[in-house]
Amino acid sequence: MKEKNMKKNDTIELQLGKYLEDDMIELAEGDESHGGTTPATPAISILSAYISTNTCPTTKCTRAC
C-alpha cells in the first residue's frame, strides 16, 4: 500500500514541475481581458445621467439644493 502512495506522490511532484515560471507568466499575460467593463456598465451610466439631468439640471438648482 505504501508503494502505491509513493508512486502517486511521485506523479504529483512531476506534474507540479511541469511548467517553468516564465511559461506561467506568458500564459497569464495572454489571458488578460482588455477594457475591464461589465455588460451592465453602459446601462448604469445612462441611468445615472438620466437621474442627474432630471433631478438637478442646472447649477442654479444645484446651489439651491
UniProtKB/Swiss-Prot annotation:
Cleavable signal peptide = none
Role played:
Lanthionine-containing peptide antibiotic (lantibiotic) active on Gram-positive bacteria. The bactericidal activity of lantibiotics is based on depolarization of energized bacterial cytoplasmic membranes, initiated by the formation of aqueous transmembrane pores. When present individually lacticin 3147 A2 exhibits weak activity towards L.lactis strain AM2 and L.lactis strain HP, and no activity towards L.lactis strain IFPL359, but when combined with lacticin 3147 A1 it displays strong activity towards all three strains.
Query: Where does this protein reside within or beyond the cell?
Result: Secreted
Give residue numbers for the modification (2,3-didehydroalanine (Ser)).
S45, S48
Q: Which UniProt keywords apply?
A: Antibiotic, Antimicrobial, Bacteriocin, Lantibiotic, Plasmid, Secreted, Thioether bond
- Reading the lineage from the top rank, the first entry is Bacteria
Q: What is the lineage of its organism?
A: Bacteria, Bacillati, Bacillota, Bacilli, Lactobacillales
Question: Which NCBIfam families does UniProt cross-reference here?
Answer: lant_II_LchA2
Positions where 2,3-didehydrobutyrine occurs in the chain: T38, T41
Posttranslational modification = Maturation of lantibiotics involves the enzymatic conversion of Thr, and Ser into dehydrated AA and the formation of thioether bonds with cysteine. This is followed by membrane translocation and cleavage of the modified precursor.
| This protein's name | Lantibiotic lacticin 3147 A2
Species of the source: Lactococcus lactis subsp. lactis (Streptococcus lactis)
Q: Locate the cross-link: Beta-methyllanthionine (Thr-Cys).
A: T58-C61, T62-C65
| Record PTM 2-oxobutanoic acid, positions in chain | T37
Which biological processes are named by the entry's GO terms?
defense response to Gram-positive bacterium; killing of cells of another organism
The UniProt entry lists the main location of this chain as: secreted
MF GO annotations: signaling receptor binding
Q: Which residues form the propeptide?
A: 1-36
A Gene Ontology cellular-component term: extracellular region
Which sites are covalently linked via Lanthionine (Ser-Cys)?
S52-C56
